[in-house]
Every structure is written in C-alpha cells, then in structure tokens.
C-alpha cells in the first residue's frame, strides 16, 4: 500500500485535506499528517520566512520522510519557496500545494489576481506565477488582494465570518483573466467567488490532489 506524508500549517486544512485526498484517489492509501502552525503564524507576524523557519521546515520534511512515505506534500503556499530549496535533499518526491495551480494559472491570460488572507502567502504565490510565466515566454500583470481580517477569523475558526469577508471583497473586484485563491483554506469558496466576480477562479487543493494521483500512478508502475 502506498503512503503519503502531509505537512499542514492551518487547522481547517489539516482537518479536511486527508478525506478529500482519499475520496479523490479512490483506493486505499496510508496518510501521515503533521501540523505545524508556527510556520504560517510566524512569517505572517514577522513579514518574512526566516532561516530558522527554513530549518524548521527541513526538519518537518525529514520527519515525514522517516515515515517511509512514497510522497510528501506541503499544503501551505507560504512554504513553497523553501520547499523548492529543500527538495534536492529529500529521497522521495515533495509536492507543494500550489505547484499545479501556478502552471494552470498562466493559461487564462496575462491579468491575474492573487487573493489571500495571510500576507506571508502573497510573495511566494506571485513569484511562482511569475516564474511559470517566464518559462512560457509570458509577462504577467499580477495584482494582489490581502484580507487580513479574514485570516484573523480563520485563526479563531470562525469560518462564517471568514467566508463573508472574502465574498464581500470579491464583489468589489475588477475583471481579471484569472483569480488565484492563494491558500488552501479558501478553496471551498471557489465557485462562490467565481459567481460573484464572473472570472475563472483557481484553488490549490483540487489541482494538487490531481498531481498527487498522477505522481502515485508513476510510482506504482
């Protein structure tokens, strides 16, 4: 039986990603979860992902590697730049939650909005989209929108307030070729924000589980 090791930073994502992944795969797998909220809270408070944070993430990833997992997945976009640095030192594939989303995000057009609740997520997501655009020979125009009050509601597990803040903000946005919801904790609003804005909306979990399934199929062959 294949096994997957997940690294989370947000409680609501940790609570739901496991079941979503099992349902999508359609076959039995072992899943090992590690939740480290410090790696989201500290960068959001300090405005940077420090060397100490990178070392902490490295230890988290190594700990999950020691479970014997076939695949490691990080479910927080704030971690992605550090994940890319750490990958060469890990024996198994490491997937970042926004890998697939960034690749798809550049296919709709050059005007992209990155919407987030945690400021620490914006820089990594914008950088990843820009790199994907450069590799495709495209120059993107990327705007950002951070709803900090929604992040406070998320930390308090007040999802009703979290959702209301984001939907109200979405109603004020201009038209974009694509809106990227930068955090997995926003994914359940994909259809509603799409309806409010009239724009294509991308979320990372759905695209990530597709990538996980494809990678597991490669490993099983």
Predicted regions and their residues:
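Non-catalytic structural scaffold of enzyme domains
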Residues: 1-221
């Amino acid at each position: 039986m294949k096994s997957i090791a997940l690294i989370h930073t947000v409680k609501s994502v940790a609570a739901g990603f496991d079941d979503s992944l099992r349902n999508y795969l359609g076959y039995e797998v072992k899943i090992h979860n590690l939740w480290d909220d410090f790696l989201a809270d500290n960068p959001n408070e300090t405005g940077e992902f420090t060397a100490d944070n990178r070392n902490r993430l490295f230890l988290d990833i190594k700990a999950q590697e020691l479970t014997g997992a076939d695949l490691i997945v990080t479910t927080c976009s704030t971690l992605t730049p550090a994940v890319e640095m750490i990958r060469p030192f890990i024996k198994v594939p490491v997937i970042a939650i926004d890998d697939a989303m960034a690749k798809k995000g550049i296919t709709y057009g050059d005007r992209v909005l990155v919407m987030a609740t945690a400021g620490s997520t914006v820089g990594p997501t914008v950088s990843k989209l820009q790199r994907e655009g450069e590799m495709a020979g495209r120059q993107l125009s990327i705007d950002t929108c951070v709803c900090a009050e929604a992040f406070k509601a998320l930390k308090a597990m007040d999802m009703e307030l979290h959702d209301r803040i984001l939907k109200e903000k979405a109603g004020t946005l201009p038209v974009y070729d694509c809106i990227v919801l930068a955090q997995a904790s926003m994914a359940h609003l994909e259809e509603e924000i799409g309806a409010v804005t009239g724009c294509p909306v991308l979320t990372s979990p759905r695209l990530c589980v597709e990538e996980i399934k494809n990678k597991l199929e490669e490993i099983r062959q």
